[in-house]
Amino acid sequence: MNIMNTEQSQNSIVSRIKVFEGQTNIETSGLPKKPEITPRSLPPKPTVSSGKPSVAPKPAANRASGEWDSGTENRLKVTSKEGLTPYPPLQEAGSIPVTKPELPKKPNPGLIRSVNPEIPGRGPLAESSDSGKKVPTPAPRPLLLKKSVSSENPTYPSAPLKPVTVPPRLAGASQAKAYKSLGEGPPANPPVPVLQSKPLVDIDLISFDDDVLPTPSGNLAEESVGSEMVLDPFQLPAKTEPIKERAVQPAPTRKPTVIRIPAKPGKCLHEDPQSPPPLPAEKPIGNTFSTVSGKLSNVERTRNLESNHPGQTGGFVRVPPRLPPRPVNGKTIPTQQPPTKVPPERPPPPKLSATRRSNKKLPFNRSSSDMDLQKKQSNLATGLSKAKSQVFKNQDPVLPPRPKPGHPLYSKYMLSVPHGIANEDIVSQNPGELSCKRGDVLVMLKQTENNYLECQKGEDTGRVHLSQMKIITPLDEHLRSRPNDPSHAQKPVDSGAPHAVVLHDFPAEQVDDLNLTSGEIVYLLEKIDTDWYRGNCRNQIGIFPANYVKVIIDIPEGGNGKRECVSSHCVKGSRCVARFEYIGEQKDELSFSEGEIIILKEYVNEEWARGEVRGRTGIFPLNFVEPVEDYPTSGANVLSTKVPLKTKKEDSGSNSQVNSLPAEWCEALHSFTAETSDDLSFKRGDRIQILERLDSDWCRGRLQDREGIFPAVFVRPCPAEAKSMLAIVPKGRKAKALYDFRGENEDELSFKAGDIITELESVDDDWMSGELMGKSGIFPKNYIQFLQIS
């Protein structure tokens, strides 16, 4: 009976198809089921966009299509027998979207869609919904359809639908974007089980990921159709209602993502018209990848693509930090940069010769101001230089008392200072008063009231009544003599020395650069080349560009700072080498640089001499130079003119000290305090000239200007070098300041930690006199350290 019913239905379908072909689209509207077709005609709009209008399919459309299929299934069979080739390709193209989007396009493709391999699962559904009589007929139909479809498959590859749908779009898309679209698909993709029901499709998807973008071929289409046809009979008896529910789900919404993926590989193109929903499913594909092909998942592939193509994905942000270390070796940071206020550019650094480099070395000993400025720029200076308040409060020794009347040096160092002597013991009863003992020397600072004076004793200051002290040097005489003090007079600039005015600020950027400020006066010491000078400013020496200054008096030609050769007349006289640079502050003073050779003309006094350098003559301090040639011993003794201000006794002592070349010298190992008037007191480290050996235990010697006897066990003989040095330098040893000392009176010598003090002379057990930068004065012994003469 089933066969008879099938033949009758086929004959009726054939007749209907013939009538249907002769009719126009208007006739199709005259069918009795027009009201059901009308809602289905709405989806044609999404079908125009080939694959993206998949949003149109809805469960209502499925029901309508099921009713329509019940009336058209017979027609589909007749068309397959008659061999209507144009319809089958349209069927396959619209089968996957559940026959909703593409059916409204044309009535013919809508009829043929029911022949798709998925229709066998829906045929029974439609018939069961229509009537129970037609339920047995769908089972044989899939078999006939398989044969008809397989016979028509040879013509199917020529169908232009497959290449038109997806490949041209996705060929231009990048691989990274395609994989990103996959990542978007899985969360919203409901029809995952449909893809699981077609394992062949999954395998094709896996293999397609590895392929490059080939165009779809007919064989691939045949394989896909054949595989679906084979699987259809198994699905007919299987789960019909679950498939219907899955079709009802909004699977077509993921159609755009499916279209992007198959375009890249070529094996999945046949799945575009048939299985768009399964393709977006990422989890089953990833599982299939890991189990079947054993290759990376899509997410990992996307990460690899982003890492391999950082320019496209923007993941190359981590690369810039690696770039900075590269140019460090190749790049050279500009050594010199023009200051902010400087219009001219800095010239290239000068090329200095070996001699110039040697001369540029910082001297071991410098002036106090030089040493102070250099120490401020170094960490050593920070530790050594301290404020006076810190010095007195923390670790500096206490100032010793001033020399009292009767002391051998009292008249020399205290008479010029306004001071008085306490007549009685004074105990301060009110704040601001000074306490002292009888006989203490009080230095008068100012007169506060009619009967009170502001005085100082050591570190303490306070008021003292006039009746409690005896004034030795009043304040009025001190004030009258003060204007004559050259230390308080304004010292003009040496207009005769080569100098220049700074036009622009020049910040020192190298060790040898001289930091200059606009408006300063810089003394020119050497013209290195046409672009650079070497000069002195604020007791600092360095090089600076010539275009930053305006030269007032230039260095004469031939005197480019290079040490002049000693002329013939130079050899005849005495010479000395400059130990430090010296800039003359008076017109009659001689300016010179460190290391220059000065021709001695005459000695002005004990501290000054007249000399000649670079054709210029002037006076200069002797403690800035070092003798080069031994002073002549025959004829007029040079040293005899060196100390014209000394007394006759001191004169003879100095001459004997120098002339007695075979004199023996010793160094004090321990301090010795005189117990009688004939004893010679000295400190540890002092160098004493032995005048006579009294016996094996006692000797007579001279220390500075004092003579006396001392025990031989307290000293040791000096080496030959020390003897020769002491013979040449009569002033003896040098001392290095350990702490800052600020003289509170004019007779005191102020210095800073690190200064080198010369012309040492012992005043008493606590005080010494010395010279620094042309100034002499007294200072406490415990503030200095004696230097060994080498």
UniProtKB/Swiss-Prot annotation:
Q: Which organism is it from?
A: Homo sapiens (Human)
Is 4Fe-4S one of the keywords? no
Q: Just give the chief location class.
A: cytoplasm
The gene name on file is: SH3D19
- CDD domains hit by this protein: SH3_Eve1_1 (cd11814), SH3_Eve1_2 (cd11815), SH3_Eve1_3 (cd11816), SH3_Eve1_4 (cd11817), SH3_Eve1_5 (cd11818)
- BP term (GO), one: positive regulation of membrane protein ectodomain proteolysis
Q: GO CC terms for this protein?
A: cytosol; nucleoplasm; plasma membrane
Per its record, how is this protein called by name?
Answer: SH3 domain-containing protein 19
Q: Does the keyword Transmembrane belong to this entry?
A: no
Location comes to:
Cytoplasm; Nucleus
Starting at the broadest rank, the lineage of the source organism is:
Eukaryota, Metazoa, Chordata, Craniata, Vertebrata
